[in-house]
């Protein structure tokens, strides 16, 4: 037998932008507005044949006994964007930006999301009082900056495109009836009608500094990201067992990433040879933040298994007092480790 799978990726992307720049005196402004559209198709087909001869690895139309068009997973996104930047004498920096995005994944009433952000910067080293001070001979550059924004994510876990629709899923197994293979269908889960974008609020505060005519430079950043709208089900909503489906997903949970970045760089040249050496360090911790209606059997269960406002990806484990060195030590050990009188233990355990 022979089989062949043909798969394609067809993506059409449109990106239109209009930019404006203007400088007057010490003032400089920059503005951009744009439109973006993405459509992606992934058609796929599979065919099977029983050739008259196995000597040639070919598939002929006359010998094809099965053909399956496994469908076309269409994706589509549409968005509007805008940005405004203001710069005064390279000292005061202001930037505003925003996106208005729509995703094919979500139901029509929850398909669009608005995601703004803003950043401010102050280059202290460009101030006259700084240039006139003795400390200016040490610092080549000093800048304080901060930003805060909202970012959307439609790649939500536990949710597939068109889960907001009712009906049936095609090509879900099958069976042989009267000598013919019949492709099966299954009813879809309860429609997800309220799920929308997961959103991340991101705060960043940083300091840029340079010394020795910018040969030695570095930066320090503190960041905090709060992601809300993580899909989860309302387990306090009771459904009869006869329903046979899980509870629909909603934007209920959240998590947090917080930490800091450090960067140091040395740049110089020897004659016409330019070189730079840099090092960076990042510390980040992940927290499971809000969870919808967690349930525990008792306070000990909550202490051991709750993830509410706790570090994520932390597992409980045993603390080892050491290894048994002899049979005598095992025989005198007061704790029944294996629940069999320690008869399964050996030196080295």
Q: Regions from the language model: what does each represent?
A:
Residues 1-319:
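Extracellular/periplasmic, surface-exposed regions of secreted and cell-surface proteins
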């Amino acid at each position: 037998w022979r089989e062949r799978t043909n798969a394609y990726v067809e993506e059409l992307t449109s990106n239109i932008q209009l930019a404006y720049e203007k400088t007057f005196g010490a003032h400089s402004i920059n503005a951009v507005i744009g439109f973006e559209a993405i459509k992606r198709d992934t058609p796929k087909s599979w065919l099977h044949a029983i050739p008259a001869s196995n000597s040639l690895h070919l598939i002929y139309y006359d010998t094809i006994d099965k053909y399956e068009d496994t469908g076309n997973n269409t994706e589509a996104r549409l968005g509007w964007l805008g940005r405004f930047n203001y710069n005064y004498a390279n000292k005061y920096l202001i930037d505003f930006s925003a996106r208005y995005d729509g995703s094919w994944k979500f139901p029509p009433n929850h398909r669009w999301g608005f995601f703004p952000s803003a950043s401010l910067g102050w280059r202290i080293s460009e101030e006259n009082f700084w240039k006139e001070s003795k400390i200016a001979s040490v610092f080549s550059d000093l800048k304080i900056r901060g930003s805060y924004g909202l970012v959307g994510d439609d790649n939500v876990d536990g949710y597939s495109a068109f889960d907001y629709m009712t009906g049936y899923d095609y090509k879900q197994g099958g069976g042989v009836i009267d000598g013919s293979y019949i492709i099966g269908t299954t009813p879809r889960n309860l429609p997800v009608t309220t799920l929308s974008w997961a959103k991340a609020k991101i705060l960043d505060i940083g300091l840029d500094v340079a010394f020795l005519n910018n040969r030695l430079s570095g930066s320090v950043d503190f960041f905090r990201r709060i992601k809300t709208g993580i899909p989860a089900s309302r387990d306090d909503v009771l459904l009869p067992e006869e329903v046979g489906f899980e509870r629909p997903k909603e934007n209920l949970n959240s998590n947090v990433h917080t930490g800091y970045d450090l960067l140091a760089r040395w740049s110089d040249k020897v004659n016409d040879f330019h070189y730079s050496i840099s090092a960076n360090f990042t510390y980040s911790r992940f927290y499971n933040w809000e969870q919808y209606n967690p349930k525990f059997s008792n306070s000990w269960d909550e202490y051991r298994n709750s993830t509410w406002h706790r570090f994520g990806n932390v597992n409980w484990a045993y603390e080892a007092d050491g290894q048994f060195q002899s049979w005598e030590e095992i025989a005198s050990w007061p704790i029944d480790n294996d629940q069999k009188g320690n008869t399964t233990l050996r030196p080295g355990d």
